[in-house]
Amino acid sequence: DEIRGRKESWKRAIEGLKHVQNAGMDPYLNITVGHYNAFNSDFEELLKYSKDNKYKTLLNVAVPSGMWQKMEEIVCDEKDRKHIQNLRKKYGNLVRNLWNPFDRNNEKILGCTTVNRLYITPLGDVLVCPYVHIKIGNILKQPLKEIVDFGFRIKYFKEHSSLCLAGEDTNFISKFMTKEKQSIFNPALAKDIFSKEEIS
């Protein structure tokens, strides 16, 4: 209620989950986790609530972009990641784009989904990820296949990364996500920020 600035926001959201479930759909809770709350008891209470009610919880890691740009202290460290992995095994209903959803043991990692999970702005700009504000093309000016092919020529997006580039790879973050005024509507241009050696 405090975050939304409205009374009974929490109550309505919780009731909404029940309505979704009663309609035969699979309700997901969504939480952003960073270094600031990875070990917070509220996080684990939410996971327990979610499991007890047969929901799933979609986890997004905190990313230093947008309003949090240049706030690298929010990024999960190795200890945070291990803790989140342990919670994944413990609760079994924690979902993340980085993880293999078919792994019954809740251990396997697919890896970062940049370029595989594009974000297209209303202006047609194609970003490698909703959280990585790097433009690889514009669908109003060139075919999507051409844009994707270019994206996969970039070393960081072509090579497997078990870390989320936007929210866990501090080297990538400091090198490519901290440009002045970089945002969804003012993305850095891939051809300008990556060297010739980084693009095959």
Give names to the regions the model predicted.
Residues V126, P130-S200:
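Flexible mid-to-C-terminal extensions adjoining Fe-S/redox cofactors in radical SAM and related proteins
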Residues D1-T114, P122-L127, Y131, I139:
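Radical SAM enzyme [4Fe-4S]-AdoMet core and its adjacent flexible, acidic
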